[in-house]
Amino acid sequence: MSKLFWAMLSFITRLPVPRRWSQGLDFEHYSRGIITFPLIGLLLGAISGLVFMVLQAWCGVPLAALFSVLVLALMTGGFHLDGLADTCDGVFSARSRDRMLEIMRDSRLGTHGGLALIFVVLAKILVLSELALRGEPILASLAAACAVSRGTAALLMYRHRYAREEGLGNVFIGKIDGRQTCVTLGLAAIFAAVLLPGMHGVAAMVVTMVAIFILGQLLKRTLGGQTGDTLGAAIEFGELVFLLALL
């Protein structure tokens, strides 16, 4: 289990992980690591939240929110933001399904992808600022948002097909079973409930689950399945929806 966690941490983040900690784990078995996604999200969100708490007293709420979002992006290497941009470039191109998938593989940033990045990053900064001004616990909110967004991404893997013949997303999409999905969602729900007592955290997770499920169905209808890019888009979308649901 520990090898799976370290393997997933090095796979979906840029945090330094000694290679020996995940050595010997077959890449084809990475799908079992989906249950570690909420824990990894919890770690990323906690670090981002700590950055906010440290900087808030020094430079104020807006700049603290800006740097916490920046740190979160840096820790993932912009991995999920890149998926969001590619997904929006492809889906909003209004081309054929095959052409959309080709556009999503293009390394160049298009207009729709650029607009999506600007909107999501600015929205996160503004929502975090508003939550802080309302006295909400930012560290707990960010930790829960990152845990839930990565946990609910399982909804785009379970009983979905991979839209391409090959790619990194194929490790997870269509490869996880119902038990793994329930465990992943259950862990995310526990983190949300513990970090944000009462029904606040759980209610925000339910809203996020519904939003991610609908997004998954729309992407499935448009692209014929999911890709690594759509998983990244779902994680970014899930973070924003969860934070918005806390307002």
Curated annotation (Swiss-Prot):
Its EC number is 2.7.8.26. Keywords: Cell inner membrane, Cell membrane, Cobalamin biosynthesis, Magnesium, Membrane, Transferase, Transmembrane, Transmembrane helix. Pathway: Cofactor biosynthesis; adenosylcobalamin biosynthesis; adenosylcobalamin from cob(II)yrinate a,c-diamide: step 7/7. It catalyses: alpha-ribazole + adenosylcob(III)inamide-GDP = adenosylcob(III)alamin + GMP + H(+); alpha-ribazole 5'-phosphate + adenosylcob(III)inamide-GDP = adenosylcob(III)alamin 5'-phosphate + GMP + H(+). One of its GO terms (molecular function) is cobalamin 5'-phosphate synthase activity. GO terms for cellular component: plasma membrane. InterPro entries: CobS (IPR003805). It is an enzyme of class 2 (transferase). The chain crosses the membrane at residues 34-54, 59-79, 113-133, 138-158, 194-214. Pfam families: CobS. It is found in: Cell inner membrane. It is a multi-pass membrane protein. GO terms for biological process: cobalamin biosynthetic process. Its cofactor is Mg(2+). Joins adenosylcobinamide-GDP and alpha-ribazole to generate adenosylcobalamin (Ado-cobalamin). Also synthesizes adenosylcobalamin 5'-phosphate from adenosylcobinamide-GDP and alpha-ribazole 5'-phosphate. PANTHER family: ADENOSYLCOBINAMIDE-GDP RIBAZOLETRANSFERASE. Belongs to the CobS family. This is Adenosylcobinamide-GDP ribazoletransferase. It comes from Escherichia coli O6:H1 (strain CFT073 / ATCC 700928 / UPEC). The lineage of its organism: Bacteria, Pseudomonadati, Pseudomonadota, Gammaproteobacteria, Enterobacterales. The gene is cobS.
